[in-house]
Regions:
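Cell-envelope and extracellular/periplasmic
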Residues: 86-415
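Positively charged n-region of N-terminal signal peptides that target proteins for export
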Residues: 1-5
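EF-hand and EF-hand-like Ca2+-sensor regions
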Residues: 56, 62-83
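Alpha-helical segments with a strong preference for the paired helices of cellulosomal dockerin domains
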Residues: 28, 44-51, 65-74
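EF-hand Ca2+-binding helix-loop-helix modules
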Residues: 20-36, 47-55
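Acidic carboxylate motifs that coordinate Ca2+ or other divalent cations, activating on Asp/Glu
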Residues: 38-42, 60-62
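Intrinsically disordered, low-complexity Ser/Thr-rich linker and spacer segments
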Residues: 22-23, 27-28, 74-88
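Bacterial N-terminal signal peptides
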Residues: 7-15
Length: 415
């Protein structure tokens, strides 16, 4: 097994540590620091992430990284990556065990742990699997959270750092925070567990059970490795140390698959297979699935009709059937027409995700046709702003509550 060996960096300034560098040794150091502290996986160290580094390594408390403190940071990162030498070879084995939790899929969840926590013996241990891209990972700032979301809860756990921990975000957060709180209130005698495997900008092929670098790399995600394998590693270990009752799968993803025609066209079939695989491998054949999406068929139809001429609409209606035509049928005809439109026309309407309408339609179809799959429509949620598609702190709290309400309605109907 190869291990990155970091060189001493006594002369490196803080700016060099955090900035790209043409010197290969210094760049290796920077990437190692980024790998450890980039909690939201956006490829840079944001203010909160740099503040965490400063808080951890500012030994003299002067508010800046001095020469010796920078060296200590580099050594700390190096020691985390290198296995301890053991005559019996146990060091390599333990390093391999640790490495399965230091993956892209777990990076943000690892930053949300608030210390190891035992699972209460009373009641059920209801575990929810959360997967998706950036708005599941969460770009909302943890410093904007207010009580009770900043406090440990006796009956809420998150899978972090290869174990069950209290759920207390320290850098960024997604919808799981408020969702878990509301579900704990819904089931006052049970404990809520969250297993989150998510990575910003990841296409659905990055989550497939039958993962391959080539397929994942259609959305440039090959280097992230198999996120499904991450999930199964967590499930196996969680089963070993606790008795989880898998109670739901939450999927917040789609934007990355709106970039290419083939991605949008195949989305439904891949999602259907993903759900089948998750249910089988979790041993929960009827596992309910909750998928927050962007808009329902009616709103999506309104959105795509804006870019069509009256003549195009007449032709499409004739293909769809005699009026009155169901929204789903008309939408299918519209999307078939748009699938043959020029990419330039679609980019003019949908920006850098010209085929996003096909993805949204596939998610809506899944909610209609697949058993125990609910597509959720939270509406327009508050965003960070500045052209950023990421949901802000207020929006993530709303999304978590809306998702928890959908879970509650599902289980109420079963009573």
């Amino acid at each position: 097994m190869k291990h990155m060996i970091l060189v001493p960096a006594i002369a490196l300034s803080t700016a060099v540590l955090f900035s790209a560098d043409k010197n290969p040794k210094r760049e290796k150091i920077r990437k190692a620091i980024l790998e450890q502290y980039d909690a939201n996986d956006n490829g840079t160290l944001d203010g909160e992430e740099r503040a965490l580094i400063l808080k951890t390594h500012d030994a003299n408390g002067n508010g800046k990284m001095d020469r010796g403190e920078r060296l200590a940071l580099v050594k700390a990162v190096a020691n985390k990556q290198k296995p301890k030498a053991r005559a019996d070879g146990e060091g390599d084995q333990k390093d391999d065990e640790a490495s399965i939790w230091n993956t892209t899929g777990f990076k943000q969840a690892n930053s949300m742990g608030g210390g190891e926590a035992a699972i209460p013996k009373s009641g059920k241990f209801r575990v929810f699997v959360l997967m998706g891209q950036s708005n599941m990972t969460g770009a909302a700032r943890a410093k904007e959270l207010k009580p009770p979301y900043t406090e440990k809860h006796d009956r809420i756990r998150i899978w972090a750092n290869g174990r069950w921990e209290y759920f207390v975000p320290s850098v960024r957060f997604g919808p799981g925070v408020s969702m878990a709180r509301q579900l704990a209130a819904f089931w006052p005698d049970d404990t809520i567990g969250i297993i989150k495997v998510a990575s910003g900008g990841t296409g659905i092929r990055g989550f497939e059970k039958n993962w391959s670098f080539e397929r994942a790399n259609l959305t440039f995600d090959g280097k992230k490795g198999s996120l499904y394998k991450d999930l199964m590693n967590a499930v196996a270990e969680a089963k070993r140390m606790s008795k989880p009752e898998f109670s739901g799968f939450v999927w917040k993803q789609g934007g990355a698959d709106g970039t290419k025609k083939v991605l949008g066209t195949e989305y439904y079939d891949i999602f259907k297979q993903l759900i089948s695989d998750v249910r089988k491998d979790l041993g929960a054949p009827d596992l309910p699935v909750f998928m927050p999406s962007y808009m329902n068929d009616e709103d999506l139809l309104k959105a795509v009709r804006r870019i069509l001429s009256d003549e195009e609409l007449r032709k499409i209606r004739n293909l769809a059937g005699k009026p009155p035509v169901k929204d789903a049928d008309l939408l299918a005809a519209v999307l078939a027409h748009l699938n043959e439109a020029s990419p330039a026309k679609l980019r003019k309407a949908f920006g850098k995700r010209p085929y996003i309408a096909a993805v949204i339609a596939a998610q809506n179809r899944a909610g209609r046709e697949l058993p125990n799959v609910a597509t959720i429509y939270p509406g327009e949620l508050p965003r960070i702003g500045g052209g950023n598609n990421h949901i802000n702190a207020e929006g993530q709290i709303q999304l978590g509550k809306i998702t928890a309400s959908a879970v509650g309605e599902f289980y109420k109907a079963k009573r």
